[in-house]
Each structure stands twice: as structure tokens, then as C-alpha cells.
A protein has these predicted regions:
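Short beta-strand elements in bilobed, periplasmic/extracellular small-molecule ligand-binding domains
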Residues: 31-55, 142-148, 205-211
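Extended hydrophobic packing segments that form well-structured cores
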Residues: 370-472
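C-terminal catalytic subdomain
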Residues: 296-415
Length: 472
């Protein structure tokens, strides 16, 4: 990624303090279990360690630590029964979900030979799960529960922990990076319009505004020929250029990509939304003609780039790229009623990681519906499971996610330079369009290879955003 971010995960464990002097063997047992649990978190996140909590004061200290670190998520390991006052001081001032980890050490107790200490230490993690959720509900806190076992390993538990960590990466990415808006949204596409202050309030994402005049000159100071040549080769390695291509032919494009990469790093940009509606002449025309492949090179490196100035779809692309490794701009493109297939795609920049074969680049005289002409890029999404995500708003500015899963199938696609794919939905193409549209999406959405609704639901819980699931 051009701009790296790392989720901050608050972690602590709780046990009833009254047990410890009664059964001293529980102290090393619980400490060992807690240390083992922390090792199950992936190294892609930063652990903010609140320690093992058995008193209200320790819980308050953990909460102070979590607030100071601005954690993106909290894992609470339940070691045995504990009262909720061990939990609430640590989380009452946080606005992130608390994931209750109810992992029992043993698959089952030896009923004939288990004493009280062994029961409390190795078979009683479930004792307070309901109590914790009851009080989290009363405090208006978002929550989830993971139940499983340590003995013999539990792949389901490990998968859930890693999935929550992936979801938490989105919050950190939105908080630690910015979105650049270059120009303004496409005139009249009112579904794309957005209040940037409300965006920052609800999604923690700050908008930096840029004028096209600055973009036209962005490459003027790029003189490192080795860097330009290397980027030109990177472009040739990424795309098959219609009619062939050479380093010399993509030199100017490579120069702009090098400049954009520096700009992204300097401004800490995780997302870009742009639209140009001026005269495509002179330097403006040069940049406009090569912007689509240039921004595709940024998407390849983790910076979501959306056309038509659509900030909301840039967020959807960034979410999918962060949780799945792919994030492609899309919209309803056509319907194949003969095969009951939805054709889904879009013109503009795309994600090379979603393409099953080398993407193509071709020159067109006009960008349909837009000013100027130049390079189009077409990507060829993998067949198999696919996830779609749209982000929309209600009349009060609250955000909503709309998600669907389908299957991309082999078959004929359009080949005039726009990315498009053939998606089959379990509900059928007609019903999919009806259901999807009734959810009130913007006309843009994002696509990712694989099935990711479960992770999207976690992202939504972290941001406290509702989700409409259209079909799975």
C-alpha cells in the first residue's frame, strides 16, 4: 500500500477477583490463557494490552489506555465467571464494538475427577456471557460473541478473530488517511452528492479538496528518469496495450503516476474521487487522456480511485480492497434476459487484482458522457463468487450499506474498453435489480472477488451503520 495503516485492537481479560485468593492456582492458569489468546491475533494489527482485570480500578485503567490509543475494536476474553463491573469501566466511554471471547480451555470436563478450581479455570468461560451482553445493551454498546474451545484447536474461532481484525482495519484506514476530491461530482448525479462535514462526523473520513490546475502541474518537477522508466515498465507489465506499447509511448503517463504516488504519500490519501468537466486541451487534455490507467496504478497499490467524483463509491471500493484485497468500481450495465444474467461493470480506472488475465488498455476518441478522449482500461474479473457493496444515505444523512453476493460466470462480454462481468444471483436477474434498487443505492457500487458479506456486517457494526442484504 502507498499509505499503510494498522488497526489498533484493545484486548483484556476478566475474572472474578474473589476466586483468586480462594484458589491461588487460578492466577498462573488465567495468565497463561490470556497470553495464549493474545497470540491468536494476527500481526497485521497493533495490540493495546489492557491486561487481566479482576477489579473495577484495573478496568478503569484499561479503559484509559484504550481511549488514549483510540482503539478500533475491543476483544474481551472471559476467563471464568466475572461480574460486569470488571468490564464496564473499560468500555463505557468507547464507541467501538466489544467482542466477547468465550473460549473454553477443555472440550469437556472430566465429570468424575474435576474439582472446583479446575472447573473455574478450565470450563467456566461461559458463565458471564449473558450478563455482559445485558449490560452492554443497557449502555448502548455494540457487541458480538465468539464461542469455541482451545483444546484441539478451533478454526472457526480463529477465522472469526481474524475477520474482526480485517473489519477493524477499515476504521483505522478511514481515520488515519484522507480522501481527495479533485473537481466536483458529475453534474446532475445528485445521488453522489455528499456533505463532507457529515462524512467526517459519521465515517471519520476527512476530505481534502484539490483543483485541477494543481493536478495538471503535478508532474512538472518529476525528473528522476530511473523512477519514470521503472514505472513505465510497471505499466507495461500491468496492461496489454492495444497495438503494442513501449516505454517511450507511456513515458508521460509514467511520469504522472510517479507524481501521483508522491502526492498520495504526502497527503496521506487512502481514497480519491475525481471528475473533470473542462476543456480537454493542452496540459489538461494530456492528463485527462491518461488519468484512467494512471489511477488504476494507484488502485493496484491500495488507494481507491473513483470516477465522476463519487466519494461514496470510493469508500465502498476502499472497504472491499481492505477486507478482501480487491475493490472494483461497478454499476448496473445491462441485463441478459436469455441467460438470466446481470451484466455489471463500468468505464474508468480499475483494480488489476480482480482481473483473471492481463488487463487491456486502448485509446478511444471520446469518453462517453464526458469531456475529451484517451486511454480506457478493461479488466476481466475472475469467475466464481463475487460480492457487491454500495454506500448510500437517507434524508437525514445517515449512511447505509447495501450488499449482495453472486457468482460470475463464463460467457460473452462487451469488449469496447469497459470492465464488465456476467453475474448470476440466486434470486434471478430481474428480482436482483428490483431488490437492489428498492434499497435506494447510488448508481455506483464496488465489486470484490469472493464472498465477504460476513465481514461487511462486521465493518457496519464498527461504524454503527445498517446493512441491507439483497441476496447471498
Amino acid at each position: 500500500m502507498l499509505v499503510d495503516t494498522k488497526a489498533k485492537i484493545g484486548v483484556f481479560s476478566i475474572a472474578l477477583g474473589a476466586y483468586l485468593p480462594q484458589f491461588p492456582s487460578l492466577v498462573p492458569e488465567f495468565q497463561s490463557q490470556y497470553e495464549a489468546f493474545k497470540k491468536t491475533l494476527p500481526d497485521t494489527v497493533e495490540i493495546v494490552d489492557g491486561g487481566m482485570v479482576t477489579t473495577k480500578e484495573q478496568s478503569q485503567a484499561a479503559g484509559d489506555l484504550f481511549r488514549a490509543a483510540d482503539v478500533d475494536l475491543v476483544f474481551l476474553q472471559l476467563l471464568t465467571y466475572a461480574t460486569s463491573y470488571n468490564m464496564l469501566p473499560a468500555v463505557k466511554d468507547l464507541d467501538v464494538p466489544v467482542v466477547l471471547v468465550n473460549i473454553q480451555k477443555l472440550k469437556a470436563l472430566d465429570y468424575d475427577h474435576t474439582d472446583i478450581a479446575t472447573w473455574l479455570g478450565e470450563g467456566y468461560a461461559c458463565g458471564a456471557v449473558g450478563e455482559m451482553v445485558a449490560d452492554l445493551e443497557r449502555y448502548g454498546k455494540r457487541h458480538a460473541v465468539i464461542t469455541g474451545v482451545v483444546e484441539g484447536g478451533d478454526p472457526g474461532v480463529q477465522a472469526e478473530i481474524e475477520d474482526w481484525c480485517r473489519a477493524a482495519q477499515v476504521r483505522r484506514r478511514f481515520r488515519d488517511t484522507n480522501i481527495a476530491q479533485i473537481g466536483r461530482p458529475y453534474p446532475g448525479m445528485m445521488d453522489l452528492y455528499i456533505d463532507e462535514s457529515n462524512l467526517y462526523r459519521r465515517m471519520h473520513l476527512y476530505t481534502k479538496q484539490f483543483d485541477w490546475e494543481k493536478m495538471w502541474a503535478i508532474a512538472d518537477d518529476i525528473t528522476d528518469e530511473d523512477a519514470i522508466r521503472a514505472k513505465a515498465q510497471d505499466i507495461l507489465d500491468t496492461f496489454d496495450i492495444e497495438g503494442g506499447g513501449s516505454i517511450e509511448e507511456v513515458w508521460e503517463m509514467a511520469k504522472y503516476v510517479v507524481a501521483f504516488e508522491k502526492w498520495v504519500k504526502d497527503e496521506k490519501l487512502g481514497l480519491i474521487a475525481s471528475h473533470y468537466d473542462g476543456f480537454a486541451q493542452g496540459k489538461a487534455g494530456v492528463l485527462d487522456s491518461m488519468l484512467i490507467p494512471a489511477f488504476s496504478m494507484l488502485i493496484k497499490q491500495g488507494t481507491a480511485c473513483a470516477v465522476e467524483g463519487d466519494i461514496k463509491v470510493a469508500m465502498a471500493m476502499s472497504i472491499l480492497k481492505t477486507i478482501s484485497g480487491t475493490g472494483q468500481l461497478a454499476e448496473m450495465y445491462s441485463l441478459d434476459f436469455n441467460d438470466d444474467i446481470a451484466i455489471i461493470g463500468h468505464s474508468g480506472s480499475g483494480d488489476a487484482d480482480i482481473s483473471d488475465k492481463k488487463p487491456t488498455m486502448k485509446i478511444v476518441k471520446v469518453f462517453h458522457g464526458k469531456t475529451g478522449g484517451g486511454y480506457l482500461t478493461q479488466f476481466y474479473p475472475y469467475t466464481g463468487p463475487v460480492t457487491y457493496l454500495a454506500i448510500t444515505q437517507d434524508g437525514d444523512g445517515h449512511f447505509k450499506f447495501i450488499a449482495a453476493e453472486g457468482v460470475n460466470e463464463e460467457g460473452p462480454i462487451l469488449s469496447f474498453g469497459d470492465t464488465n462481468m456476467r453475474t448470476r444471483f440466486t434470486c434471478g436477474a430481474r428480482e436482483f435489480v428490483n431488490r437492489w434498487s428498492e434499497c435506494g443505492p447510488t448508481h455506483h457500487f464496488a465489486a470484490a472477488t469472493g464472498r465477504h458479506i460476513d465481514t461487511i456486517l462486521k465493518v457496519a457494526k464498527i461504524f454503527n451503520v445498517p446493512v441491507d442484504i439483497v441476496t447471498r
